[in-house]
């Protein structure tokens, strides 16, 4: 009996000791878990911030250098290379990059119904329309520099916001807020102000041909963008790289037709890459990577990042053009680019809120 009482007392002491220590241990475990979650959250936040910063910087540099590289690729005021072959090279490179991305997806996830390349005629038949629109728009961007300089091009390029917004309303039946309509008016005013030339007999620096080409490019870009978005949203589960692949395939085909129509003799006699320089190669890489950067913005960042990149790119293009091409920064250009930046920002934040 005495022995049993001693054992019971020892068991009670052990249990009591556990009861005394448990709250502290639980508190310590809880503190450790909270600390781990906080550290993980902070690390995730830092990684997200770094990724957004890298994507923003990349998109800004690519956007601002597009017009500069096109102008810089000229020799004695004209293109020594064939612009149709350059366009074809851009589409081919984007197609290759899409295949590389798909290959990585197949290795990690396997081939599924949504990421396989084989498809139906009905699905593929919708891609020729945006492909040919993008081809014409991309060709026009080479010829518009006969009438505008690089900074003016960056300003006028924002006209596609207006065409995209109006076509969104007409084709996709999306409503535009009052702020967005006001942003359109500001955008037109900013583009016009930036082109004012008080020191010349001509009111605007850009001739009528440049404005017409800029408006046509904006319409083509807007319609192609809205049409492409409608295609993508028709089957949202479809891998974006598969959709891009087929779009770029048709882009290559149409650019091949353009080569045969416009530059067939020159390509056959002088070669496909005749007149290419290091700047030309950089320009092709820039155009291909710009599309990837925009996709990364949509996936890893948000639309406001694209807005900031566009605004900074306009000013950065102007500053670089001062040193490379002797561009003169005027008060009208500075005020106009500021108004354009504000209008782009208002268009982004003025999106109608979804009804609950």
UniProtKB/Swiss-Prot annotation:
Broad class of where this protein is predominantly found: Golgi
InterPro entries assigned: Nuc_sug_transpt
Subcellular location per the Swiss-Prot or TrEMBL entry: Golgi apparatus membrane
Coiled-coil features, chain-numbered ranges: none
Feature: compositional bias, Low complexity: 27-43
Keyword flag Cytoplasm: no
Residue spans, topological domain Lumenal: 74-82, 147-149, 197-211, 261-277, 336-356
GO molecular function: pyrimidine nucleotide-sugar transmembrane transporter activity
Biased composition (Basic and acidic residues): 1-24
GO CC field: Golgi membrane
TM spans (from-to): 53-73, 83-103, 126-146, 150-172, 176-196, 212-232, 240-260, 278-298, 315-335
UniProt KW keywords: Golgi apparatus, Membrane, Sugar transport, Transmembrane, Transmembrane helix, Transport
Cytoplasmic topological intervals: 1-52, 104-125, 173-175, 233-239, 299-314
Region span, Disordered: 1-43
Membrane topology (UniProt): Multi-pass membrane protein
Disulfides per UniProt: none
Family designation: Belongs to the nucleotide-sugar transporter family. CMP-Sialate:CMP antiporter (TC 2.A.7.12) subfamily.
NCBIfam families tied to this protein: nst
Known role: Sugar transporter involved in the transport of CMP-sialic acid from the cytoplasm into the Golgi. May transport important nucleotide sugars such as CMP-Kdo (2-keto-3-deoxy-D-manno-octulosonic acid) in physiological conditions.
Protein name (database record): CMP-sialic acid transporter 2
Gene: CSTLP2
């Amino acid at each position: 009996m005495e022995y049993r009482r001693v054992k019971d007392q020892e068991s009670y002491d052990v249990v009591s000791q556990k009861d005394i220590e448990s709250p502290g241990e639980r508190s310590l475990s809880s503190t450790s878990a909270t600390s781990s979650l906080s550290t993980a959250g902070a690390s995730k936040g830092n990684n997200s911030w770094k990724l957004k910063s890298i994507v923003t910087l990349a998109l800004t540099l690519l956007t601002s250098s597009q017009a500069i590289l096109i102008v810089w690729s000229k020799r004695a005021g004209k293109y020594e290379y064939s612009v149709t072959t350059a366009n074809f090279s851009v589409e081919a490179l984007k197609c290759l990059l899409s295949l590389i991305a798909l290959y990585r997806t197949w290795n990690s996830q396997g081939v599924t119904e949504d990421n396989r390349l084989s498809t139906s005629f009905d699905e593929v038949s919708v891609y020729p329309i945006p492909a040919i629109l993008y081809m014409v728009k991309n060709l026009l961007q080479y010829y518009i520099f006969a009438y505008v300089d690089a900074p003016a091009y960056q300003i006028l390029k924002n006209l596609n916001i207006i065409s995209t917004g109006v076509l969104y309303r007409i084709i996709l039946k999306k409503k535009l807020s009052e702020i967005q309509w006001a942003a359109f008016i500001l955008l037109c005013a900013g583009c016009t102000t930036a082109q004012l030339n008080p020191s010349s007999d001509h009111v605007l620096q850009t001739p009528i041909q440049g404005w017409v080409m800029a408006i046509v490019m904006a319409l083509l870009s807007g319609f192609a963008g809205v049409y492409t978005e409608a295609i993508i949203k028709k089957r949202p589960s479809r891998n974006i790289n598969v959709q891009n692949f087929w779009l770029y395939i048709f882009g290559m085909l149409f650019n091949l037709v353009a080569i045969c129509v416009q530059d067939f003799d020159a390509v056959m006699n002088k070669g496909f890459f005749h007149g290419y320089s290091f700047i030309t190669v950089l320009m092709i890489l820039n155009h291909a990577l710009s599309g990837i950067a925009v996709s990364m913005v949509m996936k890893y960042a948000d639309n406001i990042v694209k807005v900031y990149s566009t605004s900074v790119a306009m000013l950065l293009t102007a500053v670089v053009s001062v040193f490379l091409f002797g561009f003169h920064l005027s008060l009208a250009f500075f005020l106009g680019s500021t108004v354009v930046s504000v209008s782009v920002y208002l268009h982004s934040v003025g999106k109608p809120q979804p009804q609950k």
